[in-house]
Amino acid sequence: MRGLITAALALIGLAFAAPQPTLWVQPDDGVEPLIQLIDTAESSIRLKIYLWTPSRMDVVEALGRAVKRGVEVRVLMEREPAGGRPSMEVISALRDRGVELRLSKPFRFVFVHEKSMVIDDRVAWFGSGNLTGSTFKANREYMLVTERPDWVREIARVFDADWHGQRIDLSHARLVWSPDRVVRGVREGNAREKVLGLIRGARKTLFLEQAGMVDEEVIAAIEEAVARGVDVRLVGSPADPKENTYFVPGAERLRKAGVRLRYLPSPYVHAKVIVADGNTALVGSINMSQSSMNANRELGAILTAADEPRAFFRLLRTMEADWKNARPDNPFLLPPVEGVIPWTEAPKYYGRVVTVEGRIAQVESRTGVAFLKFDTTPDAFRLVFFPRVYGEFDQPFPEAYLGKKVRATGRIKIYAGYYEMIINSPSQLEVLP
């Protein structure tokens, strides 16, 4: 009898359990699931985004279709992403399709860096990914999709407050929010508290996949974790530390403290994840920086292996695969590769200076850039030229190089998922007999 009662109570618990969130992984899953999600909207869409480029006009079109169905669509966009301006092409296209659009209020936050969407007050989408080409093609991103009512309500409630430029009390938030500060008695977020709590609470392991590592308090907390015997692993993308100080210097400092550090060349790590003791994870848009935790609008969620197993274990499997594929050395700090390599092997040497050889199969000239491609396939390795140097090369440029066998020397980089070498001088390019 007791067994039957226990089983019945278990079934009741399952019946009332919160719906399981789903984890979308980029670039694995692509943009189509997002388009399909938008196409389910019947009454309302709230979309908040940091960066939206013209390469994601497919999302614009999906929102336009929603408007035609009678859906109320509101978009709140950061007014100065990365210190620049939002795409006027995207803004015009949204407004032309009947989308109600507002830019973030000046001085309210440093950046509205949150990426989220609520559909019909029923389902929410949020995480690290912007609406760009690289998000769905070249970056490691994690996005959560949830029908959990308390999460959906909270994201919608914060959207409405930000839409009107109003403060909102998040002292009892279910999710993780920035900015973590108190203004005029209002607790606006909890991000720093949650990040440090996860790190300081770790007993055996910490596993981080991060785009940035610049916050002094976070770095110190990780160093303290290592000192108390916690095994800490950190994965990020390699970069020239002279050009990009957002990840490499902090990561290398942690390596010296005993952190096991690896660099993942591809996909580019734009993720912001902490996993503690193999059972609790923080996923979202929150970077390891003072601005992200204390001055931006950001959003994340805590997942546990016990409560959100489907999303949690997909996250962990992906991170373990990235760890396996990552390298211990930053290739930007390694010496040039000796000898000449075929162009097909260029991606193996991302971050390093190499000399490649091959025949130019396609040339392309766009506004502000020209390409010499070694193959006609879209993802073929390419040489990149900017207008200031066009006159220094064989004319007519770039057509003069079509069909020519060339040898090029430079550093292998990735842009929006394309492996490439930037050519700044004729000394880098030799035409062979």
Regions found by a protein language model. Name each.
Residues 1-4, 338:
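Non-membrane alpha-helical secondary structure
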